[in-house]
């Protein structure tokens, strides 16, 4: 089961229709914290860590069918149809979940279309894998190492949210994401 961060009422008349949020590539449920809390005034909002991201389980299978099955597993535990918001990679997974019959009432897809793209994110994975984690003692050192490959400080800051400095490891299954890059930038046959 995916790791979930839940906000708002869980049951009762205040609960309303639950909203599940599926983040994009290299993200996590924590990225949606402020928005999720704001939306949780009258409904339960669940921000997921998608597989191979954050605190969720890692798997070699990072296909959109597998990601959609993960979303459906969470949705079915709520015992009612859900609203689903998917961003980028999470948006593609959300589309596949909706088309596969998951109990989804409304679907919101942000910043992605159901098509294949040609721009690979492999250079970002390569940059992250180049960081000498066994020599990193703080986020500033990791940022310095990443800056040799990624010029944009905002992108580096976003990526570094997935670095656990104390364990000297990424909270991302970079080998699986790398091996699945063609699937990630593509869109499956439904």
Regions found by a protein language model. Name each.
Residues 167-190:
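Conserved serine/cysteine hydrolase catalytic core
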Residues 5-11, 33-40, 46-85, 89:
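Active-site loop/oxyanion-hole signature of alpha/beta-hydrolase fold enzymes
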Residues 15-24:
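Short beta-strand element of the alpha/beta-hydrolase
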Residues 24-27, 88:
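Active-site glycine-rich loops that stabilize anionic/oxyanionic intermediates
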Residues 26, 50-54, 114:
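Alpha/beta-hydrolase active-site loop signature
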């Amino acid at each position: 089961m995916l790791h979930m961060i839940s906000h708002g009422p869980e049951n009762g008349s205040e609960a309303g229709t639950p909203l599940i949020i599926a983040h994009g590539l290299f993200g996590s449920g924590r990225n949606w914290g402020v928005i999720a809390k704001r939306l949780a005034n009258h409904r339960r909002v669940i921000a997921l860590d998608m597989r191979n991201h954050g605190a969720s389980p890692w798997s070699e299978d990072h296909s959109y069918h597998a990601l959609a099955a993960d979303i459906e597993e969470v949705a079915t535990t709520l015992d009612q149809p859900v609203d689903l918001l998917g961003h980028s990679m999470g948006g593609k997974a959300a589309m596949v979940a909706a088309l596969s019959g998951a109990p989804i009432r409304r679907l919101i897809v942000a910043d992605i279309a159901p098509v294949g793209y040609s721009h690979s994110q492999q250079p970002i994975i390569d940059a992250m894998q180049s960081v000498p984690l066994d020599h990193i003692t703080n986020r500033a050192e990791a940022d310095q190492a990443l800056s040799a490959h990624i010029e944009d400080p905002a992108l580096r800051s976003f990526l570094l949210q997935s670095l656990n400095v104390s364990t000297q490891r990424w909270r991302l299954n970079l080998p699986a994401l790398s091996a699945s890059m063609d699937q990630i930038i593509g869109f499956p046959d439904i």
